[in-house]
Amino acid sequence: MSALKIDAIDDADVEPVVALWQRCGLTRPWNDPHADIALARRRDNSTVLVGRDDGAIVSTVMVGHDGHRGWVYYVAVDPDGRKRGYGRAIMAAAEDWLRTAGISKLQLLVRRENEQANAFYNSLGFELSTSVMFQKWLDGRAPT
């Protein structure tokens, strides 16, 4: 393994990044990943970071903030490259990006049944929040 190189996504990365998200099971029918990438790239308060090992995209994170709290989405590590520190490195880069923006709190959402992801975030020092998340579909679809 060479040193992981992390930088912002560029145009040529979009399709490989979406393919990685699909391999990792991160895409959902109601969220167009291409639109999510485009939105993150055109705003000053968000970006998509890409980790490369020998030029191959092996990890990603979409990171943004609302001025007070940072959020990460689409945290992905190539399934063939797990347990090599890629996840820790891409999350550290997201934290650095938020610190540079003056953000001191980072939040994320994980499905309760995703034990592997929950263990990973616990190992990074994340704590289970006492907050309860509510949601409502504004287009009339049934809750998920």
Label for each model-derived stretch:
Residues V77, K83-D96, A119, S123:
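Conserved acetyl-CoA-binding loop-helix of GNAT-fold acetyltransferases
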Residues R141-T144:
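Short, charged/polar, Gly/Pro-enriched secondary-structure boundary elements
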Residues L108-A117, Q135-D139:
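Conserved beta-strand-loop-alpha-helix junction that forms the acyl-donor binding cleft
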Residues S59, Q116-F120:
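A short, acidic/glycine-rich surface segment
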Residues I6, V110, S123:
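Conserved SAM-binding loop
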Residues L98-V110:
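Conserved GNAT acetyl-CoA-binding A-motif
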Residues L4, A8-Y74, D78, M91-A93, ...:
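Acetyl-CoA-dependent GNAT
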